């Protein structure tokens, strides 16, 4: 089992009993592993027998230490960090490992899921393109992705809304769960009658069901 030093790398949230699976959960570009979004989602997942290990990319850890915002590192740096964390996990633990991430974190995970032999992949608000630049697609690898993948996406996401995504070529391994009236942070409009807290609980339920069936 993992030692204390190993777990110091992560924010761990465990279910009361034996977990069905472990999710390595990465943050988006602007908010780190302790964001309310990821904290709440981790608690909801634990209630559904899913263990999460959240982590900060090095640029975010530096930003936290310095008390100021920093831009994300280049993709190769982020991908290297993902690889290192998965290697550390596999050296310390065994069992099904799922890669997961919000926005940028999910995109980086999607680039590595097949390479790393992940049991599955969860993307929360996948950034199909930069905001305001729908011509700059980040979808080429999604057409051939073999890893079972769940993308949870707001219908109004400015980085890939429902109408846009309908026109993309996605691999059969990918399932998209749409959140009505929600934005990139899965926050719905008031007229939906739902709060973001309720949406995150529903999202955790979708993830747990996907994990139970193995995607």
Q: How would you describe each model-predicted region?
A:
Residues 108-112, 132:
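Hydrolases whose catalytic domains are alpha/beta-hydrolase-1, hotdog thioesterase
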Residues 101-105, 109:
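Gly/Ala-rich beta-loop-alpha elbow adjacent to hydrolase catalytic centers
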Residues 117-132:
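A conserved short beta-strand
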Residues 2-96, 183-193:
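Serine-hydrolase catalytic machinery in alpha/beta-hydrolase-like enzymes
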Residues 158-164:
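Conserved alpha/beta-hydrolase "acid-adjacent" motif
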Residues 96-101, 124:
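Short beta-strand immediately N-terminal to the catalytic nucleophile in serine-hydrolase-like folds
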Residues 182, 186, 190-215:
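Catalytic active-site module of serine/aspartate enzymes centered on a nucleophile-bearing elbow/loop
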Residues 144-146, 151-153, 157:
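Short beta-strand/loop motif that positions the catalytic acidic residue
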């Amino acid at each position: 089992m993992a030692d204390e030093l190993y777990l110091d790398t992560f924010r761990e949230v465990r279910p009361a009993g034996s977990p069905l699976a472990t999710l390595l959960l990465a943050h988006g570009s602007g908010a780190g592993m302790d964001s309310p979004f990821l904290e709440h989602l981790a608690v909801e997942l634990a209630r559904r027998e899913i263990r999460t290990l959240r982590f900060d990319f090095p640029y975010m850890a530096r930003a936290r230490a310095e008390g100021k915002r920093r831009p994300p590192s280049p993709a190769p740096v982020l991908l290297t960090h993902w690889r290192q964390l998965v290697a550390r996990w596999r050296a310390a633990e065994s069992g099904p490992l799922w890669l997961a991430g919000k926005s940028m974190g999910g995109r980086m995970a999607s680039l590595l899921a097949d390479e790393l032999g992940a049991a599955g992949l969860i993307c929360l608000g996948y950034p199909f393109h930069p905001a305001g630049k729908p011509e700059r697609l980040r979808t080429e690898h999604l057409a051939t992705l073999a890893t079972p993948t769940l993308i949870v996406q707001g219908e109004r996401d400015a980085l890939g809304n429902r109408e846009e995504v309908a026109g993309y070529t996605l691999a059969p391994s990918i399932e998209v769960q749409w959140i009505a009236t929600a934005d990139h942070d899965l926050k719905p409009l008031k007229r939906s009658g739902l709060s973001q807290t309720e949406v995150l609980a529903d999202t955790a339920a979708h993830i747990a069901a996907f994990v139970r069936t193995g995607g």
